[in-house]
Amino acid sequence: MDPCDCSKTGTCNCGATCKCTNCQCTTCKKSCCSCCPSGCSKCASGCVCKGNSCDSSCCQ
């Protein structure tokens, strides 16, 4: 289950490095909102995506 409901509420409890599109957080886990770019089909569970990049540690 996702740790927050960004798609429903538009907000979530996050920090300060992640660029999110559908919520007003600046840092979040992948399951919180779409931090990773469209090229990243799936992020590792519990992964914190940093910035707009998605590397091998975040993707699987």
From Swiss-Prot:
A divalent metal cation 6 binds at residues 36, 40, 43, 59. A divalent metal cation 7 binds at residues 49, 54, 58-59. It comes from the Eukaryota. A divalent metal cation 1 binds at residues 4, 6, 20, 23. Signal peptide: none annotated. A divalent metal cation 5 binds at residues 33, 35-36, 49. SUPFAM superfamilies: Metallothionein (SSF57868). InterPro entries: Metalthion_dom_sf (IPR017854), Metalthion_dom_sf_vert (IPR023587), Metalthion_vert (IPR000006), Metalthion_vert_metal_BS (IPR018064). A divalent metal cation 4 binds at residues 32-33, 43, 47. The keyword Metal-binding applies. A divalent metal cation 2 binds at residues 6, 12, 14, 25. Keywords: Metal-binding, Metal-thiolate cluster. GO terms for molecular function: metal ion binding. The keyword Metal-binding applies. A divalent metal cation 3 binds at residues 14, 18, 23, 28. Residues 29-60 are annotated as: Alpha. Residues 1-28 are annotated as: Beta. Belongs to the metallothionein superfamily. Type 1 family. Metallothioneins have a high content of cysteine residues that bind various heavy metals. Class I metallothioneins contain 2 metal-binding domains: four divalent ions are chelated within cluster A of the alpha domain and are coordinated via cysteinyl thiolate bridges to 11 cysteine ligands. Cluster B, the corresponding region within the beta domain, can ligate three divalent ions to 9 cysteines. This is Metallothionein. It comes from Barbatula barbatula (Stone loach).
